[in-house]
């Protein structure tokens, strides 16, 4: 009986204290930032990767983004048929970066972060929804205000106030937007009829970016720096409303916007990226996420990918899909580096930019004496 009891205890002990496989040298040790060392925001951000949970995912996103920014063609093996001139140019060939975001992020203060990236030519291709276009221009004309998520809709409606989460957009903003954009549509229609101009969403967006002529606008900088902005859903939102009112006010063939030419241009951004690698950073989900991923499928997947959103995968939505699902479609390379940060992008993205794009811009400015 005693022997049997000892065997049972030994078995229980063996089960509880199962010997571990060593993780030394293969995994990062968990530990957060020690504020006894003073306040150092850069070190705090660097500590995210070893903090755990979504902080670690954010830290991984910072690492992958820096890999996007640091990559040069010279890092890859030189092909046998490479000429001497091509060898010299390899150091100047950088990763092509696609940035996608949903409209609410332009409604929010993330707009200024995106404006910074376009102003300094840190991204190469932009994709957003219609709200991400119109809200940028509207903010040049009038302000958006901080409210509360709990404000009653009927009360706001009676006051001509529109709610986006905890943001408030006065309806007068859209009246100002109409006053600004309709004369531009008039001129675009004249050019379509007299000069056979073929308008596409990206061409229209560039024209509007030129017309706004405001340095607080990311679309102004995209126009100025020749960064293409794609928006397949251009007939949605307030711009769609304005296109409707403009078209019904102009009998006969009205303003025509050709979306097919833009899907060719968008896919070509990925198809003809080689020998560049491609990196994708997507804030939110929906159309921008799929449009960028689908274009990169044309080249058998992006080499780097960072998703930041709060959507879940359990309903089969593309918005909630993890990077590995995109790998199954060939939208992210099977050898690519990818991470999803489950976080509100208004929190995560400015922090990511602070430890990636902004740091490199500051270092470059010091080197160049600016």
UniProtKB/Swiss-Prot annotation:
Entry PTM: The N-terminus is blocked.
Enzyme kind, highest EC tier: transferase
Tissue/organ expression: Expressed in roots.
Reported cofactor(s): NAD(+)
Pfam families for this protein: DS
Protein name: Homospermidine synthase 1
InterPro entries linked: Deoxyhypusine_synthase, Deoxyhypusine_synthase_sf, DHS-like_NAD/FAD-binding_dom
Assembly description: Homotetramer.
NCBIfam families: dhys
Enzyme Commission number, as recorded: 2.5.1.45
Stretches that traverse the bilayer: none
Domain of life: Eukaryota
Pathway, per record: Alkaloid biosynthesis; pyrrolizidine alkaloid biosynthesis
GO cellular component: cytoplasm
Gene from which this protein is expressed: HSS1
A GO molecular-function descriptor: homospermidine synthase (spermidine-specific) activity
Organism field: Senecio vernalis (Spring groundsel)
Entry annotated with the keyword Transferase: yes
Catalysed reactions, semicolon-separated: putrescine + spermidine = sym-homospermidine + propane-1,3-diamine
Role summary: Catalyzes the transfer of an aminobutyl unit from spermidine onto putrescine. The resulting polyamine homospermidine is a precursor in the biosynthesis of pyrrolizidine alkaloids.
Keyword entries, A-Z: NAD, Transferase
Keyword NAD: yes
Listed PANTHER family: DEOXYHYPUSINE SYNTHASE
Protein family per UniProt: Belongs to the deoxyhypusine synthase family.
């Amino acid at each position: 009986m005693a022997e049997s009891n000892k065997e049972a205890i030994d078995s229980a002990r063996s089960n509880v204290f199962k010997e571990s496989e060593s993780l030394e040298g293969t995994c990062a040790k968990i530990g957060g930032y020690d504020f006894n060392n003073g306040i150092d925001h850069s070190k705090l951000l660097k500590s995210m990767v070893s903090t755990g949970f979504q902080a670690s995912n954010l830290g991984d996103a910072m690492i992958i983004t820096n890999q996007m920014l640091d990559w040069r063609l010279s890092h890859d093996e030189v092909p046998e048929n490479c000429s001497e001139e091509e060898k010299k140019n390899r150091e100047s060939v950088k990763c092509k970066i696609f940035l996608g975001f949903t409209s609410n992020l332009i409604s929010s203060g993330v707009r200024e972060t995106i404006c910074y990236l376009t102003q300094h030519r840190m991204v190469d291709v932009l994709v957003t929804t219609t709200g991400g276009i119109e809200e940028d221009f509207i903010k040049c004309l009038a302000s958006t205000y901080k409210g509360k998520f709990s404000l009653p809709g009927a009360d706001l409606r009676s006051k001509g106030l529109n709610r986006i989460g905890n943001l408030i957009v006065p309806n007068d903003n859209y009246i100002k937007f109409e006053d600004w954009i309709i004369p531009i549509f008039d001129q675009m229609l004249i050019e379509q009829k007299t000069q056979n101009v073929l308008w596409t969403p990206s061409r229209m967006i560039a024209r509007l970016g030129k017309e706004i002529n405001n340095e607080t606008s990311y679309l102004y900088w995209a126009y100025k720096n020749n960064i293409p902005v794609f928006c397949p859903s251009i007939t949605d939102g307030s711009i769609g409303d304005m296109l409707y009112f403009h078209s019904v006010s102009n009998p006969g063939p009205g303003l025509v916007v050709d979306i097919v030419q833009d899907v060719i241009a968008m896919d070509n951004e990925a198809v003809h990226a080689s020998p560049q690698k491609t990196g994708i950073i997507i804030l939110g989900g929906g159309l921008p996420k799929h449009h960028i991923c689908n274009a990169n499928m044309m080249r058998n997947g992006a080499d780097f990918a960072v998703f930041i959103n709060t959507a879940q995968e359990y309903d089969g939505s593309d918005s909630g899909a993890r990077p590995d699902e995109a790998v199954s479609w060939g939208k992210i390379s099977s050898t690519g580096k990818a991470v999803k940060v489950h976080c509100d992008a208004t929190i995560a993205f400015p922090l990511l930019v602070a430890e990636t794009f902004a740091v490199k811009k500051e270092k470059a400015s010091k080197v160049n004496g600016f």
